[in-house]
């Protein structure tokens, strides 16, 4: 994508990446920022959960060549007429199946409808449900489908299952954590409430623990 940008216009958005979450948007933005630094290309991430004022100021000062955005905030800024997408040459729909699951498909169609007729669309998706195939058929001409084999767990990762009752889960987890000598541990829970409660329990038990869940503000996430 960066190679395609060489020799073209500056100070206008030429690449638009649509991401389902703010974390993925920020991660993608930082990757573009690092890779495009030598060529002088600017990247910007746009997502909700933070004030629009700083985003609008940046967009009005100098529009970055690469714009990484979540659908909701991008539509908001488009409605305020502070985003010019008339120069977009490449559109990337990242984690398209996840965006469909989150209900973003109508928003994505609105965004695509505002883009120039001549642009390339790249669609990245772990799965290809009917809705995503229909989207590709509607907005892509003569698409090339590239499939990558399923990733395998690292050989250094061990797997085991411990059947325990609900009431014994915490003590079983403490036993497992107590056997880990160093490094970080990532624990997945079913709900946001459970993540917050478990992090507090582990902190009280002497572990350096924190929760990462949907109720956190952007500042807390960072």
Predicted regions and their residues:
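Conserved helicase RecA-like core
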Residues: 1-222
């Amino acid at each position: 994508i960066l190679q395609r940008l060489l020799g073209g216009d500056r100070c206008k958005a030429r690449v638009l990446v649509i991401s389902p979450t703010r974390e993925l948007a920020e991660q993608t933005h930082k990757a573009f920022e690092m890779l495009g630094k030598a060529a002088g290309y600017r990247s910007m991430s746009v997502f909700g959960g933070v004030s629009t004022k700083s985003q609008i100021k940046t967009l009005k000062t100098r529009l970055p060549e690469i714009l990484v955005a979540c659908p909701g905030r991008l539509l908001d800024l488009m409605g305020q007429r502070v985003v010019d997408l008339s120069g977009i040459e490449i559109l990337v729909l990242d984690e398209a199946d996840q965006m469909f699951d989150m209900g973003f498909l109508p928003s994505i169609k609105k965004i695509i409808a505002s883009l120039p007729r001549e642009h390339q669309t790249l669609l990245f998706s772990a799965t290809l449900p009917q809705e995503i195939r229909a989207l590709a058929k509607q907005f892509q001409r003569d698409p090339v489908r590239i499939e990558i084999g399923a990733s395998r767990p690292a050989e250094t990762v061990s797997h085991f299952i411990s059947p325990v009752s609900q009431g014994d889960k915490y003590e079983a987890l403490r036993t497992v954590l107590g056997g880990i000598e160093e490094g970080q541990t990532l624990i997945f829970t079913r709900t946001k409430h459970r993540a917050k409660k478990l992090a507090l329990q582990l902190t009280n038990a002497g572990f350096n623990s924190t929760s990462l869940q949907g109720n956190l503000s952007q500042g807390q996430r960072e």
